């Protein structure tokens, strides 16, 4: 069954909070399955210094906790400018204060809702009902932009990861193969031993989309899709304070062979790719996901808190 160590530790009460790097939504999926909160903040608000970089243009350090109040508390400590991180925004601090949500407007993405199983749909609809009870206007919309966003992000993520982890060659740092006869064998044996099947698949696909024959049709086009998606979401956030979606398609997953992982991850990432692609914040709470405009973390946390208070 799919689980995450950090999410499990928080769920079990072993720690009050934990940090995780959200690159492709895995942190949000494991939080949803474990029943804890996870906030992927606006890109550049939390330092990535010290993180092993894979997909640098979309990965972001976020916070696991049992409730929105604790997430807000931790974010108030870790967010802010860091000279050691070239992607860090210049703001020294951000506002994560939880406020009243009466009058806020939230959209449910019915397109993504229909892709989830019945148990997950029930969680989303129950969350929406709780928001309405707290004075939030909730309406249904249908938008398939998540599909092209997912495809674009998988291309960009694989390309960036391929480039970034090329440094792991057994020479300067990381794993080093013990048996080799020349430098080429050192590279091959080190990477064969050190990378699992999924990582190797990402490297191969990333290398392909960066090739001379595929760069323009794949990588370059994905960058253009990123801009189109960003513009489309900006228009949506002119009318809504947040978008409510499932965080994943199921409430529980059975184990599957690692060789099927690449396809499985692609299928699930349709729910989580948009925030990574365009850098907006996303909060998983009560097994559902809230997405907001850049720097709208306080709104997302407030919406989550209004529902969480009912369950206490």
Task: Identify what each model region corresponds to.
Residues 23-27, 33, 112, 144, ...:
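Acidic, glycine-rich active-site loops and adjacent beta-strand->loop/helix elements
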